[in-house]
Every structure is written in C-alpha cells, then in structure tokens.
Amino acid sequence: MTNKTITLNLGPQHPATHGVLRLILEMDGEVVNNADPHIGLLHRGTEKLIEHKTYLQAIPYFDRLDYVSPMCQEHAFALAVESLLECSVPRRAQFIRVLFSELTRILNHTLNIGSQALDIGATTPLLWLFEEREKIMEFYERVSGSRMHSNYFRPGGVAEDLPENLLEDINKFIEQFPSKLNDIENLLNENRLWKQRLVDIGVVSQKDAMDWGFSGPMLRGSGIAWDLRKSNPYDVYDEMDFEVPIGKNGDCYDRYLVRILEMYESIKIIKQCIVKMPKGQVKTDDPKLTPPTRGKMKESMEAMIHHFKLYTEGYDVPIGETYKAVEAPKGEFGVYLYSQGGNKPYRCRIKAPGFAHLQGLNFMSKGHLIADVITIIATLDIVFGEIDR
C-alpha cells in the first residue's frame, strides 16, 4: 500500500498567514512533509520607485515596507544618506531617534505576541496589548502628525522637535507598561495550553539560524547574542545600558520569551533617553539638507525659494556607495545606497529580515501538524510589505 500525500493551499486570504502569503503544503494526513511559500503578491516595485525620487521623497516608501515598525526603517535610510553626505547629526536628534526606535520595538512586539496568541486561540492578550499600542500610536501622531506612516526621521536629524509635555507622557507610559507586560506573562508563561502549542515547535539550531541568515529574535532565540545595537552601535546606542536577551532551545516558546524580555530592555533604554535628553537642535545646520523655518519663509523671499527648491529638486549626494543596517524589531534591516552624484539614488537595495526568515519555514515545519504551521508563521513575525517590497 502506497502513502498518498495531498496538496493543500493555505492562503493567500487566510487570516493566520499575516498578509498575502500563499503556502502550498504537501500533507501526509495532518503531518506536513513540505511547505512551499509563494511570495510576491504585494510586490510594488519599491526599490525601482525610489530610483525616481529625491532622497527626501524616498523616506515615505520605507514606512510602507514593514508598516508595523515604520520608524526603524526610516532610521536605516537616514543613516545611509548621512554616511554618503558625511554630515553630523545633532545629539538631541540622535536621542529622539533612539527613543522612538525603542517605542517602535514595543509597538512591533506587542502586535506580534497579541496576534500569535489570537492565532492559537487566546483573545485576551490581543485586547490588552492593543490598548498599549494605541498609546504609542498617539505618541507617533503627536510627533509626526500620523499614526502609522510617520515620515519623521530625516537625513541630518528628525522632521520636528518633540511637542511640549511629550517626554512626560512617554515617561508615564513606561512607568505603567511593565505591569501590563507582567499581566501578559502571568497569563501565558506557565499556561499549559500555551506551552503545549509553543514548546519544541519550529526548533531552529544555532547552525541553521546562521546558515539561513536569520537575525533579530529568530537568531537570539537560538542562543546567539547578536544585536547590532551592541555589535555595531549607531546614533547613541553605545551610551545606553541594556542587555541582549537570548533563548536556549530555539523553539517558538523561546522566541516568545525573547520578545517579552526585549520590551523590558526597550523600557530601560527609553528611560535613559528621557533622563539624558540634551537641549539643542534636532536638524543639522547644513542649509543644503535643512529647510528654512516657517517664520523665516514669512520674512524672506530667498528662504521661500530655498524651501521650494529643496522639496522639488532635493539635494545632490556625492558619488559613492554605502550599506547601513539597524536592529529593527524583526531583525537586521539594511539599506545599500549607490549614488552617482545626483539628487536621486542610482540604486537602493533593501535587506528585509522577514525575507530570510520566511525561507526557513519549510525546514521549521517539516514533521509538524498543520496547526503548528500557524504557530510557526506567527513566530516568524513576517510582514509582506518588507518581504515583497
């Protein structure tokens, strides 16, 4: 008697695929023999579009890649442009960037843990964590005018200084947030059903994690303490005191714990940013990069012309190439820029962490049940804006 396998299409409209993932599963009963992800359904040609935009006009495209953690991607692009321009960034702007990068990490991890719990069948964590996410989105809105696509980080600094009382409100948020995280831990950490669904599921060894190019919680969950904020610090991360949480077994449960612990570390970094926040400018004083203030534009025709030309023609970037990466919530997000000396990039290559993680889905899900595939997709923390680009 021969074993007959069946082919099952999971997605692209299934809610548990976290986007437009079409997963072709080869099944032996309920056991997965092979998982073949088909991507590209959200491809928008972002890298090509950026070639036809000025460096300033390119920033909003980065918000729309991993739209769950937009500011971290703006950060990578801003660092890459600054590297080519060899411009300095005011210290206040660097602290603001680090502050909002860590708020963005919390924004990302709360959604991941909440949606992962929902996929498995627990509704409560999602509702609790969305209350906290709403508060961070209000901080986004107050600083940039937008809840999601912020367009806030700029080459040479940030778009605007922090509004009045914002630091006090962020401080109030991080004072009460650990108790909410503690509630989630009490609900899930030793929960029998939660552990049955996560422990020993989707195990990634240290060798596999390295071979497949994993980064972020996917790498640290396997016990490798690699974090760009420590190994290759940017802005003022070298002045921050924080730990890099790592797992032991490389399973879904360890990756969940790593994300929980990372949020506690983000709180520590945010506190340090608030305490150490210096006074001063938030944009470089180079007039080629920084538009004149509204006050100056009301007084000077030259300032008005300067503002108009800056936003229509942009600024020229010297010939050269660079690669800059940041420790985004999902892993290493990198931007390779190649300039031929004009006001638009000749080439902008984007390295998204989720792309490498999704390729590992096949070996992670082999031999598991179809219900476990849902858990593994959730632990990958994939967003198709950055994978398909």
Swiss-Prot record:
It catalyses: a quinone + NADH + 5 H(+)(in) = a quinol + NAD(+) + 4 H(+)(out). GO terms for molecular function: NAD binding; NADH:ubiquinone reductase (non-electrogenic) activity; quinone binding. Gene3D superfamilies: Cytochrome-c3 Hydrogenase, chain B. The keyword rRNA-binding does not apply. Its EC number is 7.1.1.-. PROSITE patterns: COMPLEX1_49K. It is found in: Cell inner membrane. One of its GO terms (cellular component) is plasma membrane. It is an enzyme of class 7 (translocase). Keywords: Cell inner membrane, Cell membrane, Membrane, NAD, Quinone, Translocase, Transport, Ubiquinone. It is a peripheral membrane protein. NCBIfam families: NuoD (TIGR01962), PRK06075.1 (NF004739). Belongs to the complex I 49 kDa subunit family. NDH-1 shuttles electrons from NADH, via FMN and iron-sulfur (Fe-S) centers, to quinones in the respiratory chain. The immediate electron acceptor for the enzyme in this species is believed to be ubiquinone. Couples the redox reaction to proton translocation (for every two electrons transferred, four hydrogen ions are translocated across the cytoplasmic membrane), and thus conserves the redox energy in a proton gradient. NDH-1 is composed of 14 different subunits. Subunits NuoB, C, D, E, F, and G constitute the peripheral sector of the complex. This is NADH-quinone oxidoreductase subunit D.
